[in-house]
Amino acid sequence: MGKVSLKDELAGMLNPQPQERDPEALEDAFSDREDSSEEENDTLGREHYVDVSESKLRSKQAPQLDPKFKGRKTSRQELLNSGSLNSQSSSPSEEEDSEEDENDAVSEDHENFSSSEASSISEENEDDDQSSAIPEKDMDRLKKIINGEKKLSDQIRTSALEDMKKGLALKEQMRFYDNVLDTRIRLQKGCSQLLSSSNQLQGDKVEARDGLVSFIQHTLQLRKNLLIDSGVEILDSRSKRKENPVSLEEIALEMNNLDDSLNEWKNDTLTKWHNRVQAVQGISQSNKFKALNQSIVQQIENSMINKKDLVERTRIDYSDPNNKTFNPEIYNDTDFYQSLLKDFINSRMADSTRDGTVRWMATKKQKQKKENVDTKASKGRKIRYHVHDKLQNFMAPIEVTVWPDEQTEDLFSSLLGQQLDLSETANDTNTSNFVEKDDELISSNDGFSLFG
């Protein structure tokens, strides 16, 4: 920037519309040389780069605007006058005139539209009307959907309540079964002793028979009531004149009739629940022909094929191991009791999570597992060694003691490259040597005497 004369400076101060200047332009004028040197230093490392032209997007200029959008210069007085005029409230007539002008402008704009634009606008308006009318037409369908969802949620809630009731009923049934099984386990000792003392109860047969018949009658009546509640039709072949069976033949006939009446319902119920259990467990089709994966009815029929052998096994007195004869007067259900006891223990082992049970299972597995013993490693034929674990958090001990003189001398001799003697005798000899040397220096000064 060149030097400005006083006349030009005064003229610029009196000008109401002074020329705008960039305050940073002065700094740029003085920093041209520095920038050029910095640019040269920056380009030193990029001399081997390939020259690339500037992007077209960067060189693209802004579109040419209409001259009416360009601004014009104004003075501060005109700006204040225009602001005061705009702040004043307009009269109602002026507002009406402005509204009329706006309406005229809008009508003129509509007249300038083409026919295609007008048709497109009309179609859009029709679409908006149709879209606004759609919810009204579909309100019934939405209500049906909402009602259906509400019914579905109610069904899910009721099914969840039913499943909860079934679970509680099953839990109560298992508790009742456990109590009956516990009672049977407690009675096993007494039942086993009855076999050995059967010959001593000859005089009490009548009383025992009457009590047994009464118990069977109550049991048969309970079975009938349960079958009626389950909707099973009972086959009755007895005479209507007799209320309860008295003889053993009548009791056996009544029990057979109840079994025949229950047979069809029993098979259907067992098959239904067996299929549900198989579906939950996910048994594959390749294993369905195995004995354990067949239908429960088929498994029962297969187990009852040798019914005669099963009955004969219940007529053996196991209290006498030497006696293998069949006694029709006894009934020994030891095998059935052992199977029940095994199932009971397995269920307790599966359901229990106590530490004692887990510890007992671990001990049992250790006993069953065979130890891997090398028989050829005896008599020193093979070296036996044990690999120790790696040391963790280990550090050699540090002795906190004072260094002796020898160690200090070694340190200084290694650092300074000369031998030093730090003992008291060495210090005395060193001082005496220094004194003798000083005396020699004082005495021999080429004939000059320091005193006299």
Swiss-Prot record:
Which Pfam families did the record assign? AATF-Che1, TRAUB
Compositional bias segments (type: Acidic residues): 93-106
Whether Aminoacyl-tRNA synthetase counts among this entry's keywords is no
* Bias type Basic and acidic residues, positions: 1-10, 19-34, 43-57
Return the InterPro entries for the record: AATF (IPR025160), AATF/Bfr2 (IPR039223), AATF_C (IPR012617)
Its annotated compartments are: Nucleus, Nucleolus
Point to the regions of Low complexity compositional bias. Answer: 78-92
On this chain, the residues bearing Phosphoserine are 31, 36-37
Gene Ontology cellular component list: nucleolus; nucleus
| Keyword Manganese assigned | no
Disordered: annotated span: 1-141
What are the alphabetically sorted keywords of the record?
Nucleus, Phosphoprotein
One GO biological process this protein is involved in is:
maturation of SSU-rRNA from tricistronic rRNA transcript (SSU-rRNA, 5.8S rRNA, LSU-rRNA)
The entry assigns this protein to a family as follows: Belongs to the AATF family.
This protein is called what?
Answer: Protein bfr2
| Organism listed in the record | Schizosaccharomyces pombe (strain 972 / ATCC 24843)
| Gene name of the encoded protein | bfr2
